Swiss-Prot record:
Gene Ontology BP term (one): defense response to bacterium
Tagged with keyword DNA-binding: no
GO molecular function, one term: toxin activity
Family: Belongs to the non-disulfide-bridged peptide (NDBP) superfamily. Medium-length antimicrobial peptide (group 3) family. Ponericin-W subfamily.
4Fe-4S listed as a keyword: no
GO CC field: extracellular region; membrane; other organism cell membrane
Source species of the chain: Neoponera inversa (Ant)
Summary of the function given for this chain in its UniProt record: Has activity against Gram-positive bacteria. Has insecticidal and hemolytic activities. May act by disrupting the integrity of the bacterial cell membrane.
Protein name: U1-poneritoxin-Ni1a
Keyword set, alphabetical order: Amidation, Antibiotic, Antimicrobial, Membrane, Secreted, Target cell membrane, Target membrane, Toxin
Tissue/organ expression: Expressed by the venom gland.
Subcellular localization(s) per the UniProt record: Secreted; Target cell membrane
Positions where Lysine amide occurs in the chain: 20
Length: 20
């Protein structure tokens, strides 16, 4: 579960870059 949460945390910045 912690690994999945960490993956989502690191994926958020990538998603933000996609929208910018």
């Amino acid at each position: 579960f912690i690994g999945a949460a960490l993956g989502a945390l690191t994926a958020i910045p990538s998603i933000i870059k996609l929208f910018k």
